[in-house]
Design a protein with these regions (language model features):
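N-terminal active-site wall of soluble small-molecule enzyme domains
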Residues: 49-50, 73-81, 100-109
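Short, ordered loop/turn segments at secondary-structure junctions
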Residues: 45-46, 67, 97-101
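Alpha-helix-loop-beta-strand connector modules within alpha/beta enzyme cores
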Residues: 34-43, 50-64, 103-111
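Active-site mouth loops of central-metabolism enzymes
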Residues: 8, 16-20, 58-79, 96
Length: 111
């Protein structure tokens, strides 16, 4: 059962509890917003990280986008950018490299 199905069935999942706690909102209110499509809690099944909710009644999220280009390929610089984003409190990070060994760069950034 996915999160939307759980919400529509009135099931408060661990993700809903965690986001409600982080956001300082009532879990039942968040459940209702998810069930009606007013909030989402995105999740990458391949990465274990904290949950972040997006939508009505939740705080604005900060996303950091980093990545190499075909002109500048410096994996260490991307790692430094990722660390700076984390230190600055970014909620999410998008690694958008288009130049160099993409798998190696992403692996390095995620390590």
């Amino acid at each position: 059962m996915n999160l939307l199905e759980a919400a529509k069935n009135g099931i408060v999942t661990d993700a809903i509890k965690e986001v409600a706690s982080i956001e300082g909102v009532d879990a039942s209110t968040l459940l209702e917003h998810i069930a009606h499509g007013r909030c989402v809690i995105p999740r990458n099944k391949n990465r274990l990280s904290r949950f972040a909710g997006i939508g009505k009644g939740l705080r604005t999220k900060i996303n950091a986008s980093i990545g190499t280009s075909s002109d500048i390929i410096d994996p260490l610089a991307e790692v430094k950018k990722a660390l700076a984003a984390q230190k600055a409190g970014a909620d999410t990070l998008m690694e958008l490299s288009v130049g160099g060994d993409l798998d190696a760069i992403r692996k390095e950034v995620l390590s």
